[in-house]
């Protein structure tokens, strides 16, 4: 059962989408899984497991927001109440809540000790933001959930629903009630969230959903298990075929339509130059996948988790192959290195002094400013009180094309931009940006 649940977790389509980026959803998923594991551990070690669950709840607040942490905490408390195990229920609940409060409380405590002057104002703003999050759910998030949950939670969700159906007359049994507690907590959090994406809250349900799916898989007949196996073979074989076809088109320039679609995703990498070791690794993985497919088609497996194994192997092979073959495309599509490089060159012509001068960038979000600073020696700030000699702002390429304008003296529009983006960067001396219409 543990093997099947782990393989279902690896094979989920949704979690692989953002795992290549340094985003908070990865930490949020890890702490949600830790909270679920703590509740499972509490069945045999009631207070150590409850303490781990409480720590994970507090850490979820620190890495995400108060609503996500409260949602995970509600799931833990519901599991303590509904699932019978050793230890006093009240003490387990108290342990979980206390450890969660202590874990979260370390943040404001250290902040007030080290920066007490500004900590009060900061946490007032933080509290206002958390209040804005709580409300009635956004109907647009329901549309997102209806459109995406089928592939986002594939292939686990059909087997999870089957497990609930098979044990529908005895939902209080441990292996059903415990994961269902977290799923119900997610539903409560989704209803009470007005400004949190449904995708963000779905991380709370991934681990319990995989556990439910493993029990549902065990309850399936042989033909249903074979459907998952053949589905995995067909889907990932087609996907790998597409990956290699696009790589060949990117390398040889044929077929032209496929080649053009790849060029649209990248600003600088017009010619494939994947490293030979990456290509060799992708070829080895392709041979490994074909071996798994042939072996499955030639033999009838006796292990009931063969379907999740094929699905997990397929998505792993597919993702590593895509990264190996299209690493330059992925980098150039997501990076700000080329923008930062050109901005640094233009500022040098404007006599920018590193370490002394700064660039006012009020229209650029914090993540964008941080990425540009990382790839250059430019100091960007959004503070109005800063005395900067230079300014950078966003302009629309479509608007400039429809309404040609003459820029104020000293201003330039950077030629570098992110692929398929309408945003361009206007750089020049600080002061009012005067734009005159061309006659």
Residue ranges and their predicted role:
Residues 1, 22-25, 147-148:
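Extended, compositionally biased regions that are outside compact catalytic cores
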Residues 282-295, 303-432:
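Short periplasmic/luminal acceptor-recognition loop of GT-C membrane glycosyltransferases, typified by
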Residues 1-11, 29:
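Transmembrane-helix signature of polytopic, membrane-embedded enzymes
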Residues 55-56, 61-200, 208-211, 215, ...:
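Transmembrane-lumen/periplasm boundary regions of multi-pass, lipid-linked membrane glycan transferases
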Residues 20-25, 191-206, 327-333:
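Membrane-interface catalytic loops of GT-C/OST-like multi-pass glycosylation enzymes that act
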Residues 14-28, 65-66:
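Short acidic/glycine- and proline-prone juxtamembrane loop motifs at membrane-interface regions
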Residues 35-52, 56-60, 217-220:
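Membrane-interface transmembrane helices that cradle and orient dolichyl/undecaprenyl
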Residues 28-44, 209-212:
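Specific aromatic-rich, kink-prone transmembrane helix
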């Amino acid at each position: 059962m543990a093997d099947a649940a782990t393989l279902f977790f690896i094979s989920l389509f949704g979690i692989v989408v953002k795992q290549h980026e340094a985003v908070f959803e990865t930490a949020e998923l890890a702490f949600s899984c830790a909270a679920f594991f703590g509740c499972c551990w509490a069945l045999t070690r009631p207070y150590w497991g409850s303490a781990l669950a409480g720590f994970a709840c507090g850490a979820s607040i620190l890495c995400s927001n108060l609503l996500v942490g409260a949602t995970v905490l509600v799931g833990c408390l519901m599991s303590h109440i509904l699932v019978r195990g050793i230890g006093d229920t009240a003490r387990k609940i108290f342990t979980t809540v206390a450890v969660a409060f202590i874990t979260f409380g370390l943040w404001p405590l250290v902040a007030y000790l080290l920066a007490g002057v500004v900590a009060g104002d900061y946490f007032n703003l933080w509290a206002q933001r958390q209040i804005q999050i709580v409300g009635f759910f956004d109907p647009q998030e329901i549309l997102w959930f209806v459109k995406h949950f089928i592939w986002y939670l594939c292939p686990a969700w059909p087997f999870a629903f089957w497990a609930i159906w098979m044990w529908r007359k005895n939902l209080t049994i441990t292996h059903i009630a415990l994961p269902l507690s977290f799923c119900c907590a997610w539903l409560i959090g989704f209803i009470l969230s007005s400004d949190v994406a449904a995708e963000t809250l779905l991380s709370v349900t991934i681990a319990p959903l995989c556990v439910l799916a493993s029990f549902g898989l065990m309850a399936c007949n042989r033909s249903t298990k074979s459907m998952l196996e053949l589905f995995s073979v067909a889907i990932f074989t087609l996907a790998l075929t597409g990956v290699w076809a696009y790589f060949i088109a990117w390398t040889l320039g044929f077929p032209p339509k496929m080649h053009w679609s790849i060029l649209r995703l990248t600003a600088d990498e017009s010619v494939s130059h994947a490293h030979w070791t990456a290509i060799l690794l992708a070829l080895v993985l392709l041979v490994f996948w074909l071996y798994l497919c042939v072996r499955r088609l030639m033999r009838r497996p006796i292990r009931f988790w063969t379907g999740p194994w094929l699905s997990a192997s397929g998505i792993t092979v597919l993702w590593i192959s895509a990264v190996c073959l299209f690493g330059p495309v992925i980098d150039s599509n997501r990076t700000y290195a080329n923008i930062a490089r050109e901005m640094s060159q233009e500022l040098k012509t404007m006599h920018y002094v590193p370490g002394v001068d700064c660039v006012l960038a009020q229209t650029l979000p914090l993540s964008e400013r941080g990425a540009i600073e990382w790839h250059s020696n430019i100091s960007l700030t959004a503070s109005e009180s800063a005395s900067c000699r230079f300014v950078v702002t966003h302009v629309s390429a479509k608007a400039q094309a429809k309404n040609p304008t003459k820029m104020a003296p000293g201003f330039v529009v950077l030629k570098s931009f992110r692929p398929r983006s309408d945003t361009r960067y206007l750089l020049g001396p600080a002061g009012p940006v005067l734009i005159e219409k061309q006659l």
